[in-house]
Amino acid sequence: MDVFLMIRRHKTTIFTDAKESSTVFELKRIVEGILKRPPEEQRLYKDDQLLDDGKTLGECGFTSQTARPQAPATVGLAFRADDTFEALRIEPFSSPPELPDVMKPQDSGGSANEQAVQ
């Protein structure tokens, strides 16, 4: 089954999908194709816990029930900087601006679906 993932590092977010049977190392290969950093310079995390390269995504807890298209699971990403890995850091998403008045629902006293019957 497919799992849907949101790989996050600082302000970078990658949306991807993979098979539950894919390994963590294979997921690092996907990241390498996008961010041009080899797997040995990457660490992937689930809830601040380092993921083992040899385990499958399913063994790490990513299943089609927990990582759905409409609610992808979050995977943290850290890169090697010189001889050590950076600390895992994920910036929170920004808040959307307030809706303009013209887009806010209008309370006209009746349902928008009601029509006058003649």
Swiss-Prot record:
One of the record's GO molecular function terms: transcription corepressor binding
Modified residues (Phosphoserine): 108, 111
Source species, domain of life: Eukaryota
One Pfam assignment: ubiquitin
Keywords in alphabetical order: Acetylation, Nucleus, Phosphoprotein, Transcription, Transcription regulation, Ubl conjugation pathway
An individual GO BP term: target-directed miRNA degradation
Domain Ubiquitin-like: 1-79
Protein's recorded name: Elongin-B
Gene name for this UniProt entry: Elob
